[in-house]
Amino acid sequence: MKNNTQPQSSFKKLCRKLSPKREDSAGEIQQHNSSNGEDKNRELEAVFSYMDANRDGRISPEELQKSFMTLGEQLSDEEAVAAVRLSDTDGDGMLDFEEFSQLIKVDDEEEKKMELKGAFRLYIAEGEDCITPRSLKMMLKKLGESRTTDDCRVMISAFDLNADGVLSFDEFALMMR
């Protein structure tokens, strides 16, 4: 069986393609990024509706696969079944709207965590697993900010919950909220 993260990545891509778009003041088309939960829910409903080809209120693995194909994305039988299984809480082998919403929410959280891990890696020195005053100083220098090691110690101490003088990934994630 294939990796379960693949269907989620594909889900996110599909949702982006199906989300309503708007024009900005320069006339370019951009994704609609509303922080309003109601707008986000309407967008999800539109995506769900598109995928629910037979309009029975549930998305089958086959409907999921066909939705991907119409947008030029490939999803194997196994990936479609795995994607549905990830959020199928009632065990009927299909996704209702609530289950679909949960799958998208999980994907959003995983994507944010991966982005944070990527940013965290930029700030750590090779062979380290935390941000040290020295590694922070080097990264800030690359970004055009000249700081002393003592300045960096002070910056780290503001988010250093366990007072060990460095930032772990969890402390970094808290800082980035």
UniProtKB/Swiss-Prot annotation:
Pfam families: EF-hand_7 (PF13499), EF-hand_8 (PF13833). CDD domains: EFh. Binds to ABCG36. It comes from Arabidopsis thaliana (Mouse-ear cress). SUPFAM superfamilies: EF-hand. The lineage of its organism: Eukaryota, Viridiplantae, Streptophyta, Embryophyta, Tracheophyta. Gene3D superfamilies: EF-hand. Induction: By touch, salt and hydrogen peroxide treatments, drought stress, wounding, dark and infection by the bacterial pathogen P.syringae. Residues 39-74, 75-110, 111-146, 147-177 form the EF-hand domain. This is Calcium-binding protein CML38. Residues 1-44 are annotated as: Disordered. SMART domains: EFh. Residues 1-11 have a biased composition (Polar residues).
